[in-house]
Amino acid sequence: MKDYDLIDSGEGRRLERFGEYILDRPDPEVLWQKTLPEADWKIADAIFRDNWVNKNHVPQRWEMQENGIKFWVKLAPFKHTGVFPEQSAQWNYINKQISKSENKQTNILNLFAYTGIASLFASKAGAKVTHLDASRPAITWANENRDLNGMADAPIRWIVDDAVKFTDREAKRGAKYDAIIMDPPVYGHGPKGEIWDFNKDFAKLLKNCSLIISDKPIFVLVNAYAISSSSTTLANTLQGYFGTFGGKIENGELTLKEKSAGRLLSTGIWARWSSGVVK
């Protein structure tokens, strides 16, 4: 990802470049020592501890882009920035699968869709997108990203809802999607106080998704963070619900590579089923 670098990591911290600004953020997975001297870490424009400490007048938001899609980055609560750079390979996968699909118009469902970067990649590739998140501020941010790209007229449906309830209703309506993307958290709340617990609800959600996948499906992609399961568990669960379509299952870790020492930082896991039609 050209607008991002993992400059260094160590001792529970990450030093990262988001566009023109350097951020120092916590990461409990980083158990090793830093490579760069402390003086290099002091160049950070903002540091997150319990809250963001804005040292060098980082603006309220600033622009980044990847492969023609622009998005706003912000110093958001809980150390977040509105973008997960390790997912850039997934965005390119989404773009390739849709743009090379034989389907006349691909109908995509994006669940736990956050600030909408994957939705914009899907839309730009020619898909009709249903973008769902339980957080209204996240939907607002996604709309800002849409407008930044001049895509106000793109066929994207924006929905604030609980993922399990929505897919329940879609199954009863007979709705069908050619591809499904999801980034389920370990815990979360729906807009009406619904409780999301990955260990209890993930299989139910995948079952719902298996009922609304079309008869010419392209892919189902799951990214997950901070869960106790492995990517193999995700893959096995996908196989159970989508293996009847044939195709193939892939899985692995979401990683970032340091500039300082070349170490790989694992940030999450992923698994995906694909029909295999698009190579």
Regions found by a protein language model. Give the residues of each.
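Conserved class I S-adenosyl-L-methionine
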Residues: 104-114
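Conserved SAM-binding motif I beta-strand of class I
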Residues: 128-134
